[in-house]
Amino acid sequence: MSRHRRPQGFNRTDRVADQIQRELSRLLQFEMKDPRVNLATIQDVTVSRDLSYAEVYFTLLGQGEEAGAEAEEVLTKASGFLRSSLAQGLNTRTTPKLRFHYDMTPERAAHLSQLIDEARAEDRELRPEDDETGNNE
């Protein structure tokens, strides 16, 4: 006999992660009074299969790596408050322990874009004839 398998996609852990992301975003915006996390945006949440842990990835609007590390520390210290607030809205027996991670993807992307722009500018300086002929390969 073959087992019935659920289709790949939006399973229970995905639904719980989505709910945690929405609720944490609301909590950070309206419940947290610390200015170091006011500009935090929850980018992604992944939940372990047994729902015991939630990895929470966040960014800070217009802030650097140092501010991100500080915000990560603040959120880690506030994880008990955040977890108990989450427990009221989640329909699970237990509420996952929250682990916060500062997501440096936007800063890295901006840096890479800047490097590409600089390389293009240097290339144009070294080979200006390509710009005139429209042959930019």
From Swiss-Prot:
GO cellular component assignments: cytosol
UniProt entry keywords in alphabetical sequence: Cytoplasm, Ribosome biogenesis
Ranges annotated as biased composition (Acidic residues): 128-137
Region (Disordered): 114-137
One of the protein's GO biological processes: maturation of SSU-rRNA
Subcellular locations according to the entry: Cytoplasm
Membrane-spanning intervals of the chain: none
Record-linked InterPro entries: KH_dom-like_a/b, RbfA, RbfA_dom_sf
Biased composition (Basic and acidic residues): 117-127
Main subcellular localisation: cytoplasm
UniProt keyword annotation of Cytoplasm present: yes
GO molecular function: ribosomal small subunit binding
Protein family membership: Belongs to the RbfA family.
HAMAP family: RbfA (MF_00003)
Subunit structure: Monomer. Binds 30S ribosomal subunits, but not 50S ribosomal subunits or 70S ribosomes.
Function: One of several proteins that assist in the late maturation steps of the functional core of the 30S ribosomal subunit. Associates with free 30S ribosomal subunits (but not with 30S subunits that are part of 70S ribosomes or polysomes). Required for efficient processing of 16S rRNA. May interact with the 5'-terminal helix region of 16S rRNA.
The protein, known as: Ribosome-binding factor A
Species annotation: Alcanivorax borkumensis (strain ATCC 700651 / DSM 11573 / NCIMB 13689 / SK2)
Gene for this chain: rbfA
